[in-house]
Amino acid sequence: LYKNYELILVDDLSEGSVMNLPSALRKKLIKKKIQNIKKLNTKKLNGIFHLAAQASVPLSLIEFCKSTSNNLTSSIKVFEFSKKYSAPVVYASSSAVYGNLPLGSDEIKKFSVLSPYAQDKLTIENYAKMSYKIFKTSSVGLRLFNVYGPGQTATSPYSAVIPIFIYRMLKNLPIIINGGFQTRDFIYIDDVVNVMKKSMNKIQ
């Protein structure tokens, strides 16, 4: 994207590192929470990719108020900028909204909210619908399943399973699987990026 567009990046770096960015983008980073930014130094936005979130389900149970406040206020701010600039939004929702629904369930009408994080994501989807209904701002929410790829940490108690497995294999440590009958869907980060770009092209 940065080869074809002028980008504005916003991240408080509470997770991740500026070193994960290409060197050409590091000076373009605004190191703040999006909800704390009053205005952007630009006259036009072609589109917004919204990935800001506290994305750990276990942490959302431990720090319920902080987690939910962060997830909702950041998203509301994004839709506010979307309204101001008439900019479409592609945002990350989550497979967590499905909970333990059986296979074949109606994905539009049925949900099984089992955590504050899942409720946050479902609420954000409803804000997106409201924003379109009232302000005519277009958006696409992607209910992502277990994204993995380079740059993930494996040493946090809230780390995803694939980086943990890789870390333990590199250290010649056993891979611990409780039960062994669980099934999960995973998607590689490059595939997510491609879908997000295609989604943005569709609604611009």
Where are these regions (language model features)?
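N-terminal Rossmann-like NAD(P)+-binding domain of SDR-like oxidoreductases, especially those catalyzing
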Residues: 1-147, 190, 196-200
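Charged, solvent-exposed alpha-helical segments that act as regulatory interaction surfaces
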Residues: 19, 54, 153, 171-174
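Residue-level signal for alpha-helical context at structural boundaries
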Residues: 66, 78, 166, 183-184
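Glycine-rich "substrate-gating" loop/helix at the edge of Rossmann-like oxidoreductase active sites
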Residues: 114, 145-159, 174, 179-190
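Alpha-helical substrate-binding/gating segment
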Residues: 147, 163-175, 186-204
